[in-house]
Amino acid sequence: MWHYTSINNDTRVALDPKPNQIRTITKPNTVPQLGTDYLYTFNPQRRSHTLRLLGPFQYFNFSETDRGHPLFRLPLKYPSKTIPTDELVDNLHSWMRSVHLLHTRSDDNSLRYNWMLGVYARSTNYTTPVGQLVVKTPAILNYANPQDAFNSVFIALGIDYIDIPITNSNIFDDGSTPYNVRIWHAPTMTEVNHILTLMRKSTLVSTHSSWHWNVLHTFHYRSESDMIDHFSAKILEDWRQKEKFDKGALVEADRVIQRLIPLSSSTYVQRLAAIGALYPNEFTENVLDLSRLSTALLQLSDTYYQHANDQLKRLYRRMYNDSRTLYMTARHQELLLAQVAANPNILLYPYTHIFTTAHITASYISNTGQGRIKHSLAVTGTTEHSTVPDIILGPTSEDVITISMVEPMSIAAEDMYGYVIDTPTRDIWPADEQVEQKGDAVALYDTKTSRALGMFNNTVRIDDLLSPLLGRVYRTYAKGDTMAMTQGSLDHQTLCAAVDSDITFVGNRMIAPLAEGYVPRAMHRNNSTMKMLSLYVAIKKLENFAANSYLMSPDTSIILLGAEREPAVNILRRFNSSVSNVRIIGMGDRAVEPNIRVRVPFPIDKNISADFVICDINSYEDQSFESMFGETMSVVTTCASAATRSLVKINHPSEYMINSVIERLSKLGGVFYHTALLKTASQNTYSYETYIYITPIAAAVGFLFYNNSAIINRYMTAVADDEAPVIPSIHTIIKEHSNTYSPGLFCGCIDVQSAPLALSQLKSYCSEATTWRVDSDDNLVNIIARIDPARIALEFRTRSNTSAHHEYQRCVPNGLGFKIRKTREFRYMHREVTFIHKLMMYALIREQISLTESMTQVVSIGGRNLADISVVPLTMKYIVIDPAARIETLTQEKKNIEIQARAFQFDASTMDLENNSIYLFIAVIMNEPNGAATPAQTQIDKIRNVATAMLTRTNCVAYISFYESGIITRLSQSTAHKTIRVEDGRLKVANYVPVDTLPEADVTLMLRDIGITYEIIRPSTPELVNACSSYGIRLGSTGGAVLDVFNHYSPVIKLVRS
């Protein structure tokens, strides 16, 4: 059985902007961003450029004037190489700003602008009847009801349809458009039936099973090949949609069936329509060659035409001969009926037939292989050789390897609701600092912030990361089995977020089984829903940290501000349905029923108050700093005055902004407030937005301010990037010795006999490689290897022409793996926050060391696996002191590395520090070599002894990391993160034993007394971008909440002796 999250989401309507947004879209102040506004690729083999626009511009009709813009001449300027990013972005930005669309602004926020008609009218230079009408009455492009988006034009012009050419998705391809979409004036099914019958007499026409805007449209093709390509693409989209839902993925879909229906076509299209309706087993078994989609589908249709299974053969032939009928399963029908129930006025393709797929169960492909083989690649080979030619990997088809953007991740329900807080510690806010902080805040606001953070956030949204978990919860419930959970628990709330139906409890710990035959709806969510639910959990925990029930108390209320159509309101109502007299209210300046439309500050004649307020109102970006500042102050004071406990979003949490909020609260008239900054695990992981928690307290205490806050630091260091972030690449050429590779993967296939040499050559860039064959009779082997910056740093210490070819020769032919089923690989892999923090520290130290002169060596204490080699300049000797360190003698000789397999002596009298040296003590002083925890005083003694010994040396630098005591307070009041937590007053990180933390004040006082030069340094946003970009990794979904606190309270001491 397969289930949908939502079939009522018209994605095309959602892309239509508000009339007042047109100028912002066509006159963007910021330059276009890769992945957000456009996608660009260059194929060196074909010498072809592909530029695809995203957002509203993906549906754009270009005029002859547009084609004359320098943007469209760039492929001619760079016929055989990639267009420089700066030149591409500058020209794209220039072209966007040259676009002028006729429109009429409106303060009615329920209106949308018909982008399709607007850009079509412009592309004709307003010479068509539609264009002339738009010139005369531009307001006709505004609509409230989607079905009225075109009706007003039809009525005004007295026409039956509008033909609009569909532009190639690659805007650099200026060839003729493959087809026109014809928008019909057919408001009722009577007209729809008449038009569909009429189109059967036309040539090369198709249509959908349902229509965007609820307006009938048909596709009219210029050639049979264009129709075949369009049909094939939509079949693949439909099959993939069904496959996702078969697996329980909760994704939004704008129609139940994506396949097209041929109204007048050819025998080729009839064959495609028939095979598309069958949902054949060959697709789920991944045996189709998707690189030749149309050909593969037609070949598959021939197989079913003469299939050995008589039922399948008859069903295929029936579908072929009756291709104008939309064949669907009983589940399809059920979903369509649900659409009709939700919207009785919906228009649907009327000629349908229900068939069963129960007999399509034969599995014709079995996986009998041994699986893929992962090879650990040697650092240095044993065979000397001269130069080796580049190795070129051949392309792999999509049915063998699929490359997706981000690795899926697993997360527990309770982790979704984790949060971290940071409390103020300073009792004054000096006037001179106020002036300085305001200057910093204004400068950062005006220059905007990191494009890389925006790209990482947009690579995959938080709801995409959390949907697999919610999908599993939904499937468990939909099976109808009895489920045990406590009413009011996090599991209960998660079930409410997954299922759009009432949950019935038997007693307090058991959910009643579903009635036989009842299929519950899956809950529709947006990207903010789980964040709002986690904020609800946070505000309940802040009310009573020890509580395990998250139900509201009787006779209490909560307001969710900024709710336009926020599903969290209904989810919380169902979650709290067992509690008497609970009010859960959604409010926003664009809210629709059942939420309440209201602006902040609240009207003076409205007595709006609640026990809790969660405010998710965004600050508009296209306003001055002062306007944004005033708007934020107004929202904060409104929420603080309206509720006992508030959580308020701060889009620009500069130190000046947060301290100004606290100062404003101090002037509200005799009320004393406790404040704290909060981040949740269900926010976008790279977001710097934060929430301020506000609650009045009875005691007349002074207001505390922030100084060097962990959470604020994310925003303050998110400065604008000089360059766009690098998306991990797919490399197909393995050079013998090159330091020009960007982060990413080597991926491709090669003949079996060449595989050993390919593996040997990959050792220069990768620490592991995976191989497998898909056909024992084939001579090809597939290879995947992820670039490892640490391996590159090791390889390029000295150039050594050594090969491990003969070592890998033993793998041929049967040691290379065998796997038939499709393999998925990912450009970005998820990593825990502790791993990313370590990489951030390395990036920070590497930058510091790069500025150091006249040093001869870097000495790593405890660097047993050479993990910190990436910070060592190629010209310096690398020494590792660790009793567990092991590395081949050959590698030491070739790479200028020295291994001392012993424990480092921290006694000041015997410490053997050398001049002209850099020492690394990363994650070392808090544990002994055997893993036991080191007491706090012993840790301080170790730091003291290193500093004291350095005073007797010259030109010596040390980097020492430690855990600062402030993290205990922060994590003790927080619920995230499992891999970093407090146990009995000590800090437990990952699988290590809990250790003592050190007060920073005690450490710095001791260093001042010794008289050594020191600096406390901390990794921040630039290092986060560096680590994730260099290694092709992403924070796990809960890492964004705790990363800032862990970075801040895991600093590095830099000791310097000149």
UniProtKB/Swiss-Prot annotation:
Entry annotated with the keyword DNA damage: no
Keyword S-adenosyl-L-methionine: yes
Entry keyword set: ATP-binding, Capsid protein, GTP-binding, Methyltransferase, mRNA capping, mRNA processing, Multifunctional enzyme, Nucleotide-binding, Nucleotidyltransferase, Outer capsid protein, S-adenosyl-L-methionine, Transferase, Virion
Record's subcellular location: Virion
Stretches of the chain forming a coiled coil according to its record: none
MF (Gene Ontology): ATP binding; GTP binding; mRNA 5'-cap (guanine-N7-)-methyltransferase activity; mRNA guanylyltransferase activity
EC number: 2.7.7.50, 2.1.1.56
Cellular component aspect of the GO annotation: viral outer capsid
Cysteine pairs bridged by disulfides in the record: none
Domain of life: Viruses
Its biological purpose: Outer capsid protein involved in mRNA capping. Catalyzes the last 3 enzymatic activities for formation of the 5' cap structure on the viral plus-strand transcripts, namely the RNA guanylyltransferase, RNA-7N- and RNA-2'O-methyltransferase activities.
Assigned protein family: Belongs to the orthoreovirus lambda-2 protein family.
Protein name: Outer capsid protein VP4
Organism taxonomic ancestry: Viruses, Riboviria, Orthornavirae, Duplornaviricota, Resentoviricetes
GN (gene name): S4
